[in-house]
Amino acid sequence: MDIEDVILLIEKIMINQTGRTLSDTDITVIKGLHEGLTYSAIAENHNYHDGYVGEKSRSLYRVMTAELGYPVTKHNFRWVIDRMEIMRKRERRVKQARKRLSR
C-alpha cells in the first residue's frame, strides 16, 4: 500500500474513533513509521524531540487498536497496514462476486 493510501486509511480510523482528522505531525509520524524509521530518526529529520514522536505514535496506535480490535504497536505497525490492505482487497472481491450473483 502506498503512503497516501495508508494516510487515508488511518485518517478514516481517526475520524471514526475521535471525530478529528490527522494533524501534520501525525502524518509526518505515519510516513516515518511506514518507512521503518525509528522514533529518533523521525524526530531528527523533522526537528522534533524523540519523546514527542513516541507519544504521537502511541496515540495513533491506541486509536488504531480501538478501531481494529487488536493491539497495534511499533513492532507490528507495517504488518497491520499490510493486513488491512489484504482485508480491503478481499472485501472488494466479495462485493464484486455478490454483485455478479445478484444479476
Task: Identify the meaning behind each predicted range.
Residues 1-90:
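An N-terminal, helix-rich hydrophobic module
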